[in-house]
Curated annotation (Swiss-Prot):
Recorded name of the encoding gene: frbD
Pfam families with a match to the protein in the record: Thioesterase
Name recorded for this polypeptide: Thioesterase frbD
Homology family: Belongs to the AMT4 thioesterase family.
A GO MF label: hydrolase activity
InterPro entries from the UniProt entry: AB_hydrolase_fold (IPR029058), Thioesterase (IPR001031)
Length: 261
């Protein structure tokens, strides 16, 4: 496993829509955007950005900041100008927030809002990624794909533990755009409201309404929504329609909030 020089991300079209602000969704900790293709029509153009280092299992030595810079450049190349929404599931929401910071002074593209899909506030784990509970994977998934998912998940734990969103925005002397938080209703199987085990990092702050963001010092989340299922189940076949409706509503409501310009 070696480091890769300057990977180039691609912005993939997931849905076409009307004149509403386009939504750019960033990959989750697994590194892929397959789940976003399961979303029902959101009434807007939707793009997705996957981890360009997923296939080769190479590291982001520059952390969340390096990932965000890579995806920021890809968005500028694809969209060019206008108001957009950015967001993502889990890790994707955290990266999206940093992408919004990189666009804070951009004259052509303005991030009007951020959507966090069950994205807890970054916290340091006391165990290695190998000890964390991985999401259920399709039985027929090839071994090399399983390896890529496991590598991406382990790295995500380290990247999130080392990331401080507040410090990043303070260095830029900017405030984040308004955000909407969609949170899963349930705990992972084996987890609970009083479980603090690191295998269940995504549930450690589930008792808090803003999943820990209330302690971030950023004060940017304007609305919260709930989605049926646990963290790994909100995109399941039985829950994705409800999640889609909630995401559509969150985006529509973000559009009418003052986005700072």
């Amino acid at each position: 496993m070696t480091d890769s020089p300057a990977p180039r991300a691609s912005v993939q079209l997931i849905q076409t829509g009307g004149a509403a602000m386009p939504l750019v969704l960033i990959h989750d900790a697994c590194g892929t955007i397959y789940t976003y293709h399961a979303l029902s029509k959101l009434g807007r153009t939707v793009y997705g950005i996957g981890n360009p280092r997923f296939e080769k299992c190479t590291s982001w030595t520059g952390g969340i900041g390096e990932m965000a810079a890579c995806y920021h450049a890809a968005i500028k190349q694809r969209i060019r100008r206008g108001k957009i929404l950015v967001g993502g599931w889990s890790l994707g929401g955290v990266i999206a927030l940093e992408i919004a910071r990189l666009f804070a002074d951009d004259a052509a593209i303005h991030v009007h809002g951020v959507v966090l899909i069950d994205s807890p506030f970054p916290s340091k784990a006391t165990v290695t990624g190998e000890d964390l509970q991985l999401p259920p994977l399709p039985p027929g998934l090839p071994a090399n794909r399983r390896q890529s998912v496991a590598f991406a998940m382990r790295e995500a734990v380290d990247l999130l533990g080392d990331w401080d969103p507040k410090a990043s925005w303070q260095r830029a002397d900017k405030k984040p755009p308004p955000a909407a938080l969609i949170r899963a209703l349930d705990y992972l199987p084996g987890s609970s409201a009083d479980a603090q085990r690191d295998e269940f990092l995504v549930d450690r702050m589930r008792t808090q309404k803003l999943l820990g963001w209330e302690n971030s010092g950023l004060d940017f989340i304007r609305a919260t929504y709930e989605a049926p299922g646990h963290h790994w189940g909100i995109f399941s076949s039985e829950n994705v329609a409800c999640l889609s409706d909630t995401l559509s509503k969150a985006c529509a409501e973000l559009e009418v909030v003052d986005g700072g310009r």
